[in-house]
Structures are given as structure tokens and as C-alpha cells.
Amino acid sequence: MEENIESVEEWVSKLDIETTKDIHVPKLLFDQVIGQDQAGEIVKKAALQRRHVILIGEPGTGKSMLAQSMVDFLPKSELEDILVFPNPEDPNKPKIKTVPAGKGKEIVRQYQIKAEREKRDRSRSIMFVIFSVVLLGIIAAIVLRSITLIFFAIMAAAFLYMAMAFNPVIRNEKAMVPKLLVSHSSTDKPPFVDSTGAHSGALLGDVRHDPFQSGGLETPAHERVEAGNIHKAHKGVLFIDEINLLRPEDQQAILTALQEKKYPISGQSERSAGAMVQTEPVPCDFVLVAAGNYDAIRNMHPALRSRIRGYGYEVVVNDYMDDNDENRKKLVQFIAQEVEKDKKIPHFDKSAIVEIIKEAQKRSGRRNKLTLRLRELGGLVRVAGDIAVSQKRNIVTASDVIAAKALSKPLEQQIADKSIEIKKIYKTFRTEGSVVGMVNGLAVVGADTGMAEYTGVVLPIVAEVTPAEHKGAGNIIATGKLGDIAKEAVLNVSAVFKKITGKDISNMDIHIQFVGTYEGVEGDSASVSIATAVISAIENIPVDQSVAMTGSLSVRGDVLPVGGVTAKVEAAIEAGMAKVIVPELNYNDIILDAEHINRIQIIPARTIEDVLKVALVNSPEKDKLFDRIASIINNAKIIKPQKPVASTRAGQNVA
């Protein structure tokens, strides 16, 4: 049963605050996640038990925040530093050693001090030998009374210095110093590593290329080893968004790391000198949080998903939440959080809070719901704050939010606005008068971009009926870069206008044109528009051009709900339409801004007959059409269910 909650204005007026500055913002990141209670509990449980998680949902719904909050609930295990040591037996297979957090730096420092001491001792020895040679030369020159011996002694000392100073064995004092791959302090929290979009080397580790590979100039293999994100996330959380975009080889490597809890580091490029280097297995005991949109499952490695499912949880996050008292308070908390995080914008007063909540209602696209696409809603909060700052005010008001909505229109909306102006100038659609076979349909752009906001546009549809080239070989020809679903919608609608008109269309070619759809058409929300245009063309009944319409259509003529209905109604208003026909089931989903209210008559339709009554201009032909429709309905056969017949089995009597 739906809760009858009061209007947003009344609800906000009862809040015991002046601005969002009076709202308490939780310190714990987990408590800042809005509207994901069920997903939050699962993630918390997964963290406590060190389970892996797949989070699936729309962008901006809090998946990364949920993943990041897991580090606060991970069991307090001892973090470890990871060191890589040279391997005297096989230089291309460096050794790996783990020590408690904070000890790695001490060990490296001890080796560095030892190397520096050995270097100083060796330098003293070299200088002693050089001075000895020079001194012997001077003594010999004095004894033999030959100044040339001093010159030869100096030359010998110089050659000796160069030979000893540039000797690879002597020069590589630091070759035995280990490299610290992963470092922590004893007070660090478990690491959270975001590896979204990382290439193979950054994700799995890599061995840098060595341009000097011989002659004593090469860099020791262990010094060229670089830890990957899977190793940096050891004892912590590894987060990968858009998991399906990872290469299959990388997904397979992550699967191996999950199974073994360790993974060796090797060169990722076959052309690199590091390609021949492979370390001992490096610890990588992490909790994997994989996230993605709804299409992520299709391209995810089956074995990796099976591993996560077998040792963890799969969670679908919410796109919207119920519009009730508790969730409205969460939205107010969200506004306060965004202001605190940004640190550059002022707080919001009550009037601004009202506008943000109304926008959340509108973007949900459903009645009695609030959107959870909060990243984009946060963008509106920041733009409104920027406007207030530019006007040198220390409070954000409703006027700032309204101005922000106009200023921060998505690209699709800006393009659509320009497109509508061009279409008006060149009259590709009309807003008055009547035309046979021409309908003002409505569509949305941006539905496939992943954005929360839909942008509505007027989609003129024209139908024309011509005799078929060959008898009995009539075709339905639809043009306008139609997608698969749109093509199927045209075929489905053909059943409706065959039934409504009652005419044999096998001798007709029905041409349907989607005007100006250079970017293509996809979806079935133009079904009622197609049916109306074709019926108008077949029956020669004009269509009222001040009417716009949207809705899907079943083969039986029922008008079905569609998406983005608010954006479509707004497009009809901006185009100057007087009426708009929408599916009856979508009627309560329409949420208009104050600037759009009472500017258009919204007519709900349950069947195609409801659409035709409004869209077709009154005429004798229209009366005949509806008389025909009435006779079809009256003559429809009603099939009564038959009583079930009792069945008998051999050897049984049924009473």
C-alpha cells in the first residue's frame, strides 16, 4: 500500500533546521551511503567475513562508496610489508619476503647503511693504493734521479683509479640492497586500492625495461620489479569498476590470484628486458569488489564470476528509493554531505532543499520514488553552490537551484534545444492545423549514455499509402535508421491498423518515415504514433498537429507504459504543443517543474481508440471509423472457460 506523504514544501517547512549546516554528517563512510540499506548490510557482512562481492547497478548509485566503506569493517589482521631481494643463484628470479608492517623500511635502511659503509671502506682502500703508487713513484724518482718516474706513477695511479672505480663488481655496492615493494606503518588501516581502468602492468605488477643490459651497466633485476595493485591491496580491498572491460587474460590472472592468494610479478611486455624476469609468488590476499552496469555480467569471465559467487555475494544496488519521510531526510543529509565534501560552496536553505528533492522525484521517473543516481544530483548541488558564490551570497536558495538546472543541462538537452529551433524554422513539424498521415511523436535522447536525465525531443512521423507494385505483394516500408526493437514495433503495430481499418492491405505499400532521425531510432515508444499516422493515411482522416503522443502498443491495441515520459511531456511543452497523449499507466509518473505546469493538456490513453479519439480531427470519415471499431468490439467472441473433464485411469473409478 502506497504511503500518502505530504507535499515537499509542507514537509520541508516542518524540518527543525535553518540550513543544511544544521544537519549532522556521519563520520563513517558507510553511514554516508544513501538508499542502499540492503546492499550495505551485505557488503558489511562480506567485509567482516572477508568475502568477495559483485556490485551491479547504474552509474552514480554508490557502488564505489560501498566498496570503500568495507575497509572499516575488515578484521584487524596484521598488515605486511613486502620486500624483493636479489637472487644470487638466478638473477632473473628475485626472492620475495614479507615482514610485519613498518619493518620493511628498517630492513632496507639497514642494508643501505651496510652498503654505504662498504662503499666508504672500499673508497679508503682505493685511495690508499693510489697514494701508495704515487708515493713509490716519488721515492723512485728521487733515488734514481728521474723526474719521468713521477709522471709514470701518476699515470699508473690514474689508470688504477679508473679501473677500480668503474669495475662493475665494485660499483654495484647497492646491488644487494632489497627493494620495498609494499610499505605500511603499524597504524595504517587496511588498504583500499581502486584499480578501475588499470592496464596489466599496473594491475598485476611489472618489471621495468633495462636499456643497459650488458657491460656492467645493467640495473639489477630486483630493483626493476614494480608491485601491482593486487599486491598493494594485500590484506585490504581491491576495487575494480567496469570489470567487464578488463581483458580476459587479466580476469584470468585475477582468478588465479584469488585462488592462490599470491601471484608472481613478471614483465608484461614481451619486448621489454623485464620479460625474462619473474619473481617468486608475491602475497596478494585481498577482498575483491567488482562493480559494473547491468551489461557487465555478459562480458565477465565465467570462472571469475563463479569464484566470486562461490566465495562471496552478488548484489544489485537500487536505482531509486521510496518517497517517504525517512528517505527525504536521507536526501537532506546527502545535500549536507556534498557541501562538506566540496568545501567551496555554501549550505542550502529550505527553499533550495525543496527544489533538490523535487528534482530527485523527477529523475526517478516513477511516482512516489526518489532517484539514487546521486552523483549527477550532486553535480546539480555543486552548480547551484557555484552560482551562489558567484553572486557573493553565503546561502544557496531555490533560485540558485532553478538557475543551475538551466545552466547544467546535459549535452543531449542542449543539442535537442537547438534541434527544436531548427525544426521550427524549417517546419519539419507543425504545432497547429491538421495533416493527413503526419503525427508528432515524442522520443528521448541520451537513454543509452548512462545518464540519469532523459532529454525529450519531438519526433515527426509521416505515413503514406500507395498501390503495391504487384497484386497481393504489399509491404510495410519504414525508414529512419531504425534499430531492431523499432523494426519489430512497426511489425507489431501492423496488426493493429489491419484490425482497426478492416481493409485488405496486401495490395498496398505502406511507407513510414521518421523525419530527421540522423542519429537513428530505437525502442517501441513510437508505436502509437506509427499506428495513428498509418490509420490516418489509410482512412484519409487528418491528424490534429497540436497533439503530440508517446506510448508503446500491444498487438491487441492496448497502450503500454514507456520510459522518460516526463522528459517527453516537457519536449512537447517546449515545442508549443497544446495536448499530449501518454499511456494511462504513466500518467502519475509525470512530475513537471513550476515553469511547465498548466502549459499543456495531458491526456491518458488506455487503448488505441482513446488515442484516435483525441488525435484525429472530427469528420464523417472519423465517425465511420469508430462505428466500424464499435462493431468489431461488439462482434468479438467471448470464450467461456470449459469445465474440466475428469480423467480416469485403468482400474480406477471416478465418482
From Swiss-Prot:
Superkingdom of the source species: Archaea
Lon proteolytic domain mapped to chain residues: 433-618
Binding site for ATP: 57-64
Cytoplasmic side: 1-123, 167-655
Active-site positions on this chain: 525, 568
Chief subcellular location: membrane
GO MF annotation list: ATP binding; ATP hydrolysis activity; ATP-dependent peptidase activity; serine-type endopeptidase activity
Annotated EC: 3.4.21.-
Pfam assignment, any one: Lon_C
Transmembrane segments: 124-144, 146-166
Alphabetic keyword roster: ATP-binding, Cell membrane, Hydrolase, Membrane, Nucleotide-binding, Protease, Serine protease, Transmembrane, Transmembrane helix
Subcellular location: Cell membrane
Spans within the Extracellular topological domain: 145
Topology of the protein relative to the lipid bilayer: Multi-pass membrane protein
Subunit composition and interactions: Homohexamer. Organized in a ring with a central cavity.
Protein family per UniProt: Belongs to the peptidase S16 family. Archaeal LonB subfamily.
Entry protein name: Archaeal Lon protease
Source organism phylogeny: Archaea, Methanobacteriati, Thermoplasmatota, Thermoplasmata, Thermoplasmatales
